[in-house]
């Protein structure tokens, strides 16, 4: 494995971002690190979140010699990036909720942000709204349950549509025309979300924008010869997780995604 792109999340949500990056960089090597022992991140205290993420990512970067880190988690990106960038010497890319494109796309100027409770309450989120959606009415919806529902869907192939409809009922009645998916888990539920919310609501996420940023950064750090060498070989994919056990369904899904190696990383926070 040669200087992989390291994609990090609390669970499997970051795979939606990884998929977008692979569309642009199909021959690159990838590591996917998910801290599922501490899932969901939206319920952690800020300092616990920062210290745990920085220690875990630093450990895997040192081991894999990653070329770039993508924090594919909205909750972590709102608080972890400064400390992570101070620790690492390689580029770090975070996730920004797609508030700006949502405001530009909305015709009714009524938009929503669906995210974890942690992202919804961060000052950073309110700054984004003030800066890019000042001319819009913005509704905020926080849910950790949807994160767990996305994880369950991937692990078991099943989703409780009746419960999903209940969770989304405040959004249905909010009369929005654009909804920002402010958690990387939520694109995993895109079809079901669209089914409940109807075709009148456009769903936006940040995956494509992140992929373009990663491609740009790699082009700045690699020579033309290295880029050509990458294009002429098969991609190698490795996954790391922190929980003591993962389900057979999740293992099967990761293998189907192309991961050849799955390994548990032991940390002080991963004894669950």
Curated annotation (Swiss-Prot):
GO terms for molecular function: glutamate racemase activity. It catalyses: L-glutamate = D-glutamate. One of its GO terms (biological process) is peptidoglycan biosynthetic process. The keyword Isomerase applies. It holds the Pfam family Asp_Glu_race. It comes from the Bacteria. Its EC number is 5.1.1.3. The active site is at 73 (proton donor/acceptor), 183 (proton donor/acceptor). Substrate binds at residues 9-10, 41-42, 74-75, 184-185. Pathway: Cell wall biogenesis; peptidoglycan biosynthesis. Keywords: Cell shape, Cell wall biogenesis/degradation, Isomerase, Peptidoglycan synthesis. The keyword Protein biosynthesis does not apply. Provides the (R)-glutamate required for cell wall biosynthesis. PANTHER family: GLUTAMATE RACEMASE. This is Glutamate racemase. It comes from Shewanella sp. (strain MR-4). The gene is murI.
